[in-house]
UniProtKB/Swiss-Prot annotation:
The lineage of its organism: Bacteria, Pseudomonadati, Pseudomonadota, Gammaproteobacteria, Pasteurellales. One of the early assembly proteins it binds 23S rRNA. One of the proteins that surrounds the polypeptide exit tunnel on the outside of the ribosome. Forms the main docking site for trigger factor binding to the ribosome. GO terms for biological process: translation. The keyword Transmembrane does not apply. This is Large ribosomal subunit protein uL23.
Length: 109
């Protein structure tokens, strides 16, 4: 896999209560990934970038919500979420903390 593709597969960690519980209990990390990425690419990207052994990868395509402003209808984009189970107990707490800090600095909630 090329270096460009490797970096474009993983987008961001998905921070939620369910993701945090999965990380603590079943050693699973939840990531936002490219919509066209497959399980093999996701596993290879995580293994190479973070130097961990990947046990399994499960993916879900989250459908975008329909939104309305006045009489105008719009739709948010679909996105893909990957549940990556790691072989050993190694969770990226620093990555999730840095991501949250970056979002707060940029004004996101």
């Amino acid at each position: 896999m090329s270096q460009e593709r490797l970096l474009s597969v993983l987008r961001a960690p998905h921070i939620s209560e369910k993701a945090t519980n999965n990380a603590e209990k079943s050693n699973t990390v939840v990531l936002k990934v490219a919509l066209d990425a497959n399980k093999a690419e996701i596993a290879a990207a995580v293994a190479q970038l973070f130097e961990v052994k990947v046990d399994s990868v499960r993916t879900v395509v989250v459908k975008g919500k329909t939104k309305r402003r006045g009489n105008k209808m719009g739709r948010r984009s679909d996105w893909k979420k990957a549940y990556v189970t790691l072989a050993k107990a190694k969770i990226w707490t620093s990555w999730t903390v840095q991501s949250n800090r970056r979002k707060l600095e940029n004004g996101y909630r």
